[in-house]
């Protein structure tokens, strides 16, 4: 056959004839490789993950926080990292363009960017899928009420750019004044604190209807929610007791 030879990486069965090899090079399927970006992976770690893929080529900057849609992406050997990153960012833009017009009425955010910022907090605050809309509802209430969001991940982000802190948060860090710490500033941080997934964004665009304003860990990986500070303080006392029993305090 005089068909052109395709560029790419191919799988050749052992013992293939020269004719079969030529046919594979002309008409075969190029091997696709995969890279997965999990929900809540900050951009500094997205960058690390792409740079660690030996089959990709070229340099990329650390992407803007919140610009990458967590998912599994395929690529060919020798493809530019910049091309793969561009697909990840286009996927986020496409998802937001589709999701934003379907948002519920009277939500707490006024723009797509604000939705991504709040979704990044929801993403970092709960790993329990069934809680996402509840956590989004709670933070939406706090935004609307002009309350401090008091989200611990916003303390950590300026310190580590989203990498694990690896220790307890210090009192001085809780009191720090910067563009992200929601213990010392009313409203949303100046930007996202991670790359939120579809579910966290969807939760912010259609949060649970709840009167909850407070939450604390419940010892099972989830949270205990409360409408009043008094109720919340009881939940905090229970959490401290669980931690004492575990030898964490």
Label for each model-derived stretch:
Residues 17, 42, 231:
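Residue-level recognition of oxygen-bearing side chains
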Residues 1-30:
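Terminal hydrophobic membrane-targeting helix
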Residues 31, 48-57, 66-249:
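Bacterial extracytoplasmic/cell-wall-associated proteins, especially those involved in peptidoglycan
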Residues 13, 38, 224:
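Small/polar loops that bind or transfer phosphate-bearing groups
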Residues 1-7, 38-44, 66:
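Acidic helix-start/capping segments at beta-turn-to-alpha-helix junctions
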Residues 62-63:
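Short helix- or helix-capping micro-motifs
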């Amino acid at each position: 056959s005089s068909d052109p030879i395709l560029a790419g990486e191919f799988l050749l069965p052992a013992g293939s004839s020269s004719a079969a090899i030529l046919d594979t090079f002309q008409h075969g399927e190029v091997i696709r490789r995969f890279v997965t970006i999990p929900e809540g992976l900050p951009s500094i770690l997205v960058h690390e993950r792409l740079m660690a893929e030996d089959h990709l080529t070229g340099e990329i900057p650390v992407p803007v926080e919140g610009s990458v849609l967590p998912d599994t992406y395929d690529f060919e050997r020798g493809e530019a990292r910049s091309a793969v990153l561009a697909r990840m960012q286009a996927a986020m833009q496409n998802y937001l363009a589709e999701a934003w017009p379907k948002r519920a009425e009277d939500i707490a955010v006024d723009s797509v960017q604000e939705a991504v910022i709040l979704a990044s907090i929801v993403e970092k605050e709960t790993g329990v899928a069934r809680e996402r809309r509840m956590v989004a509802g709670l933070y939406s209430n706090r935004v609307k009420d002009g309350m401090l969001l008091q989200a611990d991940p916003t303390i950590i982000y300026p310190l580590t750019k989203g990498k694990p802190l690896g220790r307890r948060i210090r009192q001085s860090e809780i009191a720090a004044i910067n563009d992200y710490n929601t213990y010392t500033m009313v409203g949303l941080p100046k930007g996202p604190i991670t790359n939120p997934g579809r579910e966290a964004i969807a939760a912010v665009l259609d949060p649970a209807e709840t009167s909850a304003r407070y939450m604390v860990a419940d010892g099972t990986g989830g949270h205990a929610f409360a409408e009043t500070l008094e109720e919340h303080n009881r939940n905090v006392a229970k959490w401290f007791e669980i931690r004492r029993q575990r030898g964490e305090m």
